[in-house]
Every structure is written in structure tokens, then in C-alpha cells.
């Protein structure tokens, strides 16, 4: 991801997080697709530090990376999650929500 894309991503997550908190909407975030970026850039690092990572499921990985590594894709020609890929990710996500009491703000 180029620097503009990285900044947009972090800014969007930050803005959405703040909106949910302001409106007292319980939320959990995760990456559907890989989002590797260099947070050594000061502007990125400053905003990244403001993210509430307690509400971010596996922030260093993505659903896509999980299904690829676990071979839970639809087919060799379609890397979308299989039914089992969705189910396993969902179970982990539910466990994360319950373990961290994230159903409320």
C-alpha cells in the first residue's frame, strides 16, 4: 500500500472508532485484507497509537491471510473464504468479543 493509502486506512479506522464511541455503539474491527504498513513514519505512528486496539481483532493479520494459511479458500482459482473459512473466523471473532467483553461500550 502506498503512503496515501496507508494514511487513508488509518484515518478511516480512527474516524470510525471515534464515531462509534461518540454514539456509544459497540464495535469490533478486523482486517478483511492484508494491511501491512510502516508505522515508523511519525504521522502514521501518532494516529496508530490512538487506535483502540483492544477492539481490533488480530490487527497484524487479516481474514484473507488466515484462510490462505489454513487452506480454507473456496477453490484454487478463487481465494475467497470457503464456508468453513467463514465459520472458523467467526468462531474466533466471537471468542475475542466475549473474552474482552466487547458487546457494550
Please annotate each region the language model reported.
Residues 1-105:
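Alpha-helical cap/lid subdomain in secreted, periplasmic
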Amino acid at each position: 500500500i502506498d503512503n496515501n493509502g496507508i494514511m487513508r486506512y488509518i484515518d478511516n479506522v480512527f474516524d470510525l472508532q471515534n464515531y462509534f464511541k461518540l454514539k456509544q455503539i459497540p464495535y469490533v474491527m478486523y482486517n478483511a485484507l492484508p494491511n501491512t504498513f510502516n508505522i515508523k513514519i511519525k504521522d502514521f505512528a501518532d494516529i496508530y497509537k490512538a487506535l483502540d486496539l483492544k477492539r481490533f481483532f488480530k490487527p497484524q493479520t487479516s481474514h484473507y491471510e488466515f484462510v490462505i494459511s489454513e487452506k480454507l479458500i473456496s477453490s484454487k482459482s478463487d481465494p475467497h473464504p470457503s464456508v468453513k473459512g467463514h465459520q472458523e473466523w467467526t468462531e474466533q471473532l466471537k471468542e475475542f468479543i466475549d473474552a474482552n467483553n466487547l458487546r457494550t461500550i
